[in-house]
């Protein structure tokens, strides 16, 4: 039908745009990450439960520099609770979590972007930082970083309240990466992000030298 043909054409347009984004995103391969020391996170004998439901039982783990881990489990298994405990957003029932002094978390959560919606997009990003450092000694401006995430100059001066749901999620992701973290925590990012944004994220992560934890 005409409608299904239109959907098919639209898919190929999006796919093409995503590929272009990945090519344009090569500049991110020279990013200068915040320094990460030898001590990352040490988890010792951590317990967590909700009533009779056990989330963690004597959990031990030591994170190493550059480590990439995936967490899988059914809905309600406690994955989000676990990553929140690691970042000390939630408290464990017992045990110790020692976080290195140089660790800078970047946390993409299911809660979404919390920000004053009467701000313009560019103002919100500049409140985080003016520039994103590159290994070459140069930097990307807030406006350039926004363009990399598909916010053209006109869209950058749009009020956040006027953005679509997908654009707000993209801005949420961008705001986390622009802080230049060295330990990224991504809670089910593929649930919320569109194909072009996932293309940019994939390119970013392919050369990200820090620790990565993906649910």
Language-model segments: what does each one mean?
Residues 29-215:
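ABC ATP-binding cassette signature C-motif
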Residues 18-21:
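Amphipathic alpha-helical coiled-coil segments
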Residues 1-4, 198:
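Amphipathic alpha-helical coiled-coil segments with heptad-repeat character
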Residues 3-15:
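Interdomain "pre-motor" coupling segment immediately N-terminal to P-loop NTPase/helicase cores
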């Amino acid at each position: 039908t005409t409608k299904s043909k239109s959907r098919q054409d639209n898919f190929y347009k999006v796919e093409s745009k995503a590929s272009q984004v990945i090519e344009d995103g090569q500049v991110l391969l020279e990013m200068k990450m915040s320094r990460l020391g030898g001590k990352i996170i040490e988890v010792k004998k951590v317990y967590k439960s909700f009533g009779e439901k056990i989330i963690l039982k004597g959990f031990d783990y030591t994170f190493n520099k550059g480590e990439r881990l995936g967490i899988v489990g059914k809905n309600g298994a406690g994955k989000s609770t676990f990553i929140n405990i690691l970042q000390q957003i939630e408290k464990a029932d017992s045990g110790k979590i020692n976080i290195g002094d140089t660790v800078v978390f970047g946390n993409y959560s299911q809660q979404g972007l919390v920000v004053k919606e009467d701000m313009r997009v560019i103002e919100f990003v500049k409140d985080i930082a003016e520039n994103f450092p590159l290994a070459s000694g140069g930097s990307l401006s807030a406006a350039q970083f926004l363009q990399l995430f598909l916010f053209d100059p006109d869209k950058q001066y749009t009020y956040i309240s006027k953005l679509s749901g997908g654009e707000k999620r993209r801005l949420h992701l961008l705001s986390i990466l622009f802080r230049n973290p060295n330990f990224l925590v991504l809670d089910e990012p593929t649930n919320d992000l569109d194909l072009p944004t996932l293309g940019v994220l994939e390119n970013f992560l392919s050369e990200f030298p820090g620790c990565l934890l993906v649910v």
